[in-house]
Curated annotation (Swiss-Prot):
InterPro entries: Ribosomal_eL30, Ribosomal_eL30-like, Ribosomal_eL30-like_sf, Ribosomal_eL30_CS, Ribosomal_eL8/eL30/eS12/Gad45. SUPFAM superfamilies: L30e-like. The lineage of its organism: Eukaryota, Metazoa, Chordata, Craniata, Vertebrata. Component of the large ribosomal subunit. This is Large ribosomal subunit protein eL30. It is found in: Cytoplasm.
Length: 116
């Protein structure tokens, strides 16, 4: 019960930070565009939905590791990630280039340490 409440709270904070990135920052949606930004070294953080295909997930993680880009595994599926981004379509992969006014990049390592 307590763990479920904590994950809901962290999900809400991630969603609110994502909305701020959508308004004030620069980002790309989609696998191909995200991979392109990672290879160019422009991506600061990559967010993957939990139902992202395994091959795509491993490729993104590999390229992110090479370019020293952070990867966050979003706890919702691609429909929920799309909704969190304010889009009416599914989003499996999202790369944040410039967070704008959001502190999403600084807050992600804390979130990941809490999950382990």
């Amino acid at each position: 019960m307590v763990a479920a409440k904590k994950t809901k709270k962290s999900l809400e904070s991630i969603n609110s930070r994502l909305q701020l990135v959508m308004k004030s920052g620069k980002y790309v949606l989609g696998y191909k565009q995200s991979q392109k930004m990672i290879r160019q070294g422009k991506a600061k953080l990559v967010i993957l939905a939990n139902n992202c295909p395994a091959l795509r997930k491993s490729e993104i993680e590999y390229y992110a590791m090479l370019s020293k880009t952070g990867v966050h595994h979003y706890s919702g599926n691609n429909i929920e990630l799309g909704t969190a981004c304010g889009k009416y379509y599914r989003v499996c992969t999202l790369a944040i280039i410039d967070p704008g006014d959001s502190d999403i990049i600084r807050s992600m390592p804390d979130q990941q340490q809490g999950e382990k």
